[in-house]
Amino acid sequence: MNDEFKIDSHRFAQVRNARNTEIAEDYTEMIADLIRETGEARAVDLSKHFGVTGPTVNSIIRRLVREGLVESRPYRSIFLTKEGKLLADYCKKRHQIVYNFLIKIGVKKDVAKNDAEGLEHNVSS
């Protein structure tokens, strides 16, 4: 029973870490997109895009600041650090590769767009 608990807790930790990585990737990619499209990335825009509350966005941004991926000050735009830009660029390229692959195998564009968003996080580098 004790070994079974250790295995389950290990699996849970793996899933939690994978989800945290996915969130960091999605947020850095979206911050880069917002900066490119509108000139700035704001917490309210992230909240609208991801369909989450302001406090949820603020919590994630604080974590990304601790991880060295973004810079943020209260009531100001959010900026990517050098590391954040590298991650966002990497994720954007990986997303495009998955999307292009889905199109080549005959998946409709609207379906490929949605599916690529989920699949990109499950592709090993």
Regions found by a protein language model. Give the residues of each.
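N-terminal leader segment of winged-helix/HTH proteins
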Residues: 1-21
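A ubiquitous short alpha-helical element
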Residues: 14-16, 82-87, 100-101
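N-terminal helix-turn-helix DNA-binding core of bacterial DNA-binding proteins
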Residues: 14-52
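Residue-level signal for threonine
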Residues: 21, 80-81, 124
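Canonical helix-turn-helix DNA-binding module
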Residues: 43-78, 82
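Basic, amphipathic "hinge/linker" alpha-helix immediately C-terminal to the N-terminal HTH DNA-binding motif
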Residues: 76-95
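Amphipathic alpha-helical dimerization/coiled-coil segments
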Residues: 96-125
